[in-house]
Each structure stands twice: as structure tokens, then as C-alpha cells.
Amino acid sequence: MTAAAANDDWRRYRPATADFDGRVIMVTGATSGIGRAVASALVQNGATVILHGRSEKALEALYQELKPLGPEPSVAQLDLERAQGPQYQQLTNEIESRYGRLDGLLHNAAILGDKSPIEHYDIGLWQRVLLVDLTAPFILTRCLLPLLRSSADASLVFTSSGVGVRGRAFWGAYAVAKAGLENLAQTLTDELENTPIRVNVVNPGGTRTKMRTRAYPAESPASLPTPESVAPPFLYLLGGASRGVRGRRFDVREPTTPA
């Protein structure tokens, strides 16, 4: 991935009136943190959003919250730790039946795992993290590519991390998964070069989320930007304003900012 231009236009992006009209966009990990902030902003700006999460209760609460704010969203309950091929295909069939296409897909769902030396990293946990953070995005993308191809302007966005570009001690499976996600995005960029599907990566940097608190329990959340404040680059990439932008990594904070 090529780093995005240094100007801040995409950091401060505010959607124009028609940027999301008629666009159907799926957000994974939509019930909390950055996923929730992006999903909410998309609905409020006119997109039809497919809300993904693993908790039916959390999805229903989010659906009720967002329903009055814009086009009616839909929910896609799928546990990425346990889902098998048939469940992914069923979800794909439901999206195709309801919408006929997909204009955007944000891969945001992830789990942290442990911050632990490789020597002591639990093998089962390692496998879980790679399954949710890397394998699941691959499977979901593979299943949904035909629906993305049905769009005149489709956007595929991956949420990455600074440790996906340069590994650091104790970040273990999470760092390895994010590095794999960066490579998956690069591979897709090349493979989809002559299609309407554009692929980009966003590294939001440290953000006020539950995952960040788990990673840095002694850190003051007030010192970090809110999920809402880092949402604009995601909106920029998922909407029509970024048509033609592909193969870029957008570091919301400075590239050297710890994840």
C-alpha cells in the first residue's frame, strides 16, 4: 500500500449531500468503537447500512438507535470465531436477495488477543485472533466480491494498525494478523485493478475504544481522539468522493503514532 498524500482533506472530510445516496454499505464490528461511529455517520448521511456483529442483542439495540436517523439499516449477525462456509454463503445470499449489490465493505471487526511474548503466547488464542482478524475478512471478501462487482463504484476498506506495517514486541497475533490484512489489501488491489472495486487501508492510530483500553490500561482515554473524530477518512473512502482512489494506506494520525 502507498501512503496517502500528506494534505488533510480526507482527514476533515464532510460528506456532500449526495455522496451516499443509494449506496449499500456493510460495516463489520458495527456495534462498538470505530465501527459504530462509522455506521452511525453513514446512516445519517444517507447510506443504507448492513450492520454486522456477533451479539444479536447489541445489533438490535444499534438498529433501533439508527433507524430514525436515515435509511433503514439491516442487521447481519455472524460470529466470526465460529462461522463456517455455509453461514457466510447464507449471509451473501441474503444481501443479494435484498439489495442485489454491495457498494462498500468496511472490515473493522477484530479482537486483540494477549500482549505477550511469542515464546509464551497461547496457541489456541493465536489461532482465534488470526481467524477473526485475518481469515474471516478473507472469507467474507471472497463471498461478497460478486456483489461488489455488481456496483458501478465499489469500495473495499480494511481497518489496519501501525503494528501491521512494523511489528512490535508483545503485539503477537494481532500484529501478524494486521500485517496479513495489509498484504491481503495489496493483493486485492492488484487483482481488481481493472474492475470498479477499489481497495484501501485505514490506520486510525490510537483511539478511545475498549480495545485500546485493554492494550494500554494505564493510559487516560481522555488523551485519545474519539471514534467519531477518526470516522471522516472511512466515510471519504466508502463514498463517491474518493472514486478512483485505490491502493492507498491512510494514516489518520502520523504514520509513526503507536497503534
Go through each PLM region and give its residues.
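C-terminal helical subdomain
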Residues: 4-10, 194-197, 201-202, 209, ...
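Conserved glycine-rich cofactor-binding loop
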Residues: 31-32
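Rossmann-fold cofactor-recognition segment
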Residues: 68-84
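Substrate-binding pocket helix/loop in short-chain dehydrogenase/reductase
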Residues: 91, 116-118, 122-127
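Active-site helix of classical SDR
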Residues: 141, 177
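Residue(s) in the substrate-gating loop at a strand-loop-helix junction
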Residues: 161
